[in-house]
Regions:
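Active-site histidine-anchored catalytic micro-motif
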Residues: 1-131
Length: 131
């Protein structure tokens, strides 16, 4: 379980790497599944936070809160846009495991991207398979 602080990205790489290490799997795959439809899992640059700021700005322009096209408005003006943003990104990721950890590129990090304005408790299932 991960607690978000509202709209934006939260790096979860270290938590995922700890799960993989505890699994005892040295070679295989790590599958991540987010149990929600208004947030995403993304593999993104982890060195320059401006990258994630730019992604957020672009997504807000692409799918603005309170768009008059949306009929689903009962949960607030940010809910339906959050569902669409989730569809445009990912709610699951599969990563290679080598030497007992996720084999990520130098500048890659795993992020939970919250699309709602308020913070939420989010659940990620981590499944590690291999040898």
């Amino acid at each position: 379980k991960v607690r978000t602080r509202g709209r934006g990205s939260l790096q979860v790489t270290d938590t995922i790497q700890q799960h993989v290490a505890r699994s005892g799997i040295t070679q295989g795959l790590c599958h991540l599944f987010l149990h929600h439809t208004s947030a995403s899992l993304v593999l993104c640059e982890n060195a320059d936070p401006d990258v994630r700021t730019d992604m957020e700005r672009y997504m807000l322009r692409l799918v603005p809160d309170g768009d008059s096209l949306f009929e689903h408005v009962s949960e607030g003006p940010d809910d339906m846009p959050a569902h669409i943003r989730s569809l445009l990104t990912h709610t699951d990721l599969t990563l290679p495991v080598g030497d007992g950890h996720c084999s990520l590129g130098t500048w890659q990090g795993v992020y939970l991207w919250e699309h709602r304005q308020q913070g939420h408790r989010r659940q990620i299932t981590v499944t590690v398979t291999g040898v």
